[in-house]
Regions:
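The canonical Cys-X-X-Cys-His
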Residues: 44-47, 91
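A short glycine-leucine-enriched loop at secondary-structure breakpoints
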Residues: 82-86
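Short pre-active-site segment immediately N-terminal to redox-active cysteine/selenocysteine motifs
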Residues: 40-43, 87
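Hydrophobic beta-strand anchors of alpha/beta hydrolase catalytic cores
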Residues: 36-37, 91
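N-terminal leader/targeting and pre-domain segments
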Residues: 1-34, 115-125
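Non-catalytic, surface beta->alpha helical segment in thiol-disulfide oxidoreductase systems
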Residues: 87, 92-125
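Typically the conserved alpha-helix immediately C-terminal to a functionally engaged Cys/Sec
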Residues: 48-60
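Thiol-based oxidoreductase modules, predominantly thioredoxin-like and allied folds used
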Residues: 17, 39, 63-78
Length: 125
């Protein structure tokens, strides 16, 4: 049984994988003004919908101010517990270690891009 219908996703849209134990250090390293943590799971059709949408217009989801991180909540259930998830995908937005917000479920490309660009503008102000 396949674990995803989008096996090429992380090769075509690179993100740093994080473990629950290392998340705070990654968020606090100052590598980018904002981080998006993509929480997903194997055999998750809604995660695959989001992955396909991101790949279909990858340039829209790349911002110089943003670093993407990802974690599989089935392999790292502590990530789901920490953020009180009831489903995936979920996208958590951070400025350093400060959580700015969560996008869940996948709202579609336009709404997602609009929400992130709003956070970028607010963070720059």
């Amino acid at each position: 049984m396949a674990t995803t219908t989008v096996p090429e996703f992380f090769r075509q849209f690179p993100m740093r994988q994080v473990r629950a134990a290392d998340l705070d250090a990654a968020l606090g390293d100052g590598a980018a003004p904002l981080d998006i943590l993509f929480l997903w799971g194997h055999d998750c059709p809604n995660c695959d919908v989001a992955k396909r949408a991101i790949l279909a217009a990858a340039a829209r989801f790349r911002w110089p101010e943003v670093r993407w991180l990802h974690g599989n909540v089935y392999e790292e259930p502590e990530l789901g517990t920490r953020f009180g998830l009831h489903g995936v995908p979920a996208f958590i937005v951070f400025a350093g270690t400060r959580k700015l917000g969560r996008i869940s479920p996948w709202p579609g490309s336009d709404a997602f891009v609009e929400a992130i660009e709003r956070q970028i503008a607010q963070h720059a102000a």
